[in-house]
Amino acid sequence: AEKLVNGLEDESRESRLAAIQAVGMVQSNLAVTKLIEILNNSDFQDERLAATMSLGFIGDNRAIPKLNDLLNDDEPNIRWDSAIALAKMGEKTSIPIIENLLDRQYLMTFPELDYKEIDKVIMTAIETSTLIVDSTFEPSLIELAKNDQSLTVRDLAIKALKRSYDRTI
């Protein structure tokens, strides 16, 4: 893992990006401080997004303040992934963004997302809503379970309601 952490300082952008992703996959706590530095200093959105995701995979509490800052980032994917990372750590600060991600109409305001990607985002948000059970999510989950255009999304929402909220639809 130490070699991977050293790769975070590689001169090659591709190598750096690969190292950022790899330290997340192996959940290297050694990388947390360096990943936060990347978030503070990198001008590259792909590096910042990968660092955000890696901090979520690692799940180290030292990242919570930075992830909370990222909830207001200019880049939507970074806001979204920081919310998911925080939810994995049980942080309720993620709730408003996760709630937005359960809303198909909200997601359709992002022209860069196609229907397949929107479904994927919603399904990730449904799964995330089961990590940090909160009544805020219930109305959105019920709406998805009853009325969403995707049967896969409906099914996942039904299962989440049953498993986490003891609700049968």
Enumerate the language-model features and the residues they cover:
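A short, hydrophobic/aromatic-rich structural module that often spans a beta strand
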Residues: 82, 139-167
